[in-house]
Amino acid sequence: KKIEMDVLRNGEVIGYSNYFFESAENKMTVKNYTKFKVKLLGVTVFSVLSESIEKYENDKLFFFQSNTFQNDKEKFVNLKYNESSKKFIINGSSYKGEASLDCIIGNWWNHKIFKASKQISPLSGSIKEQVVIFLGKEKININNKEYLTEHYKLKSKDESLPDDKKLNFDIWFNPENNLIIKVSYSKMGN
């Protein structure tokens, strides 16, 4: 199974974020490949090239690893579940330490992100407290298909964070198939 997401800027496809799922008995592996570039006047002003792998057993995360180049700067996350402490151990480019099990990897395939109070950055390992607000039901059209969705706003709990560190996303979720079908945020366009 797979989820293929186009990354758009001002309505134009600039890249992708694709998720591939493998399941066997009580285990699941999710691989993600993301690549996009934002260009202004022909010059690349923002870029992401990333690969990650998540592993779950009995629907519980026990391993996550990512390698990312964001604007040619290398970022990474190595996360493992520690059985004795019952915590995640994170070695990331922005955070090294423990995280509680109520944290979720901030990836767009997982609708459980709406229930979490904290997310772990899939690029750097930093932990961000979040607030999720249900805005209402909304019909949206994607690729000439209409969906009845639930529209959410996901924001950083800490309003004092610098803008480039804040979470600020609009998310449209299709409860019929438990899929996030659209994510929007403003950074150098929509």
Question: Which residues fall in each region the model found?
Answer:
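Hydrophobic transmembrane alpha-helices
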Residues: I104-W108
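Acidic/charged, solvent-exposed loop-and-adjacent secondary-structure segments enriched in E/D, K/R, S/T
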Residues: S84-C103
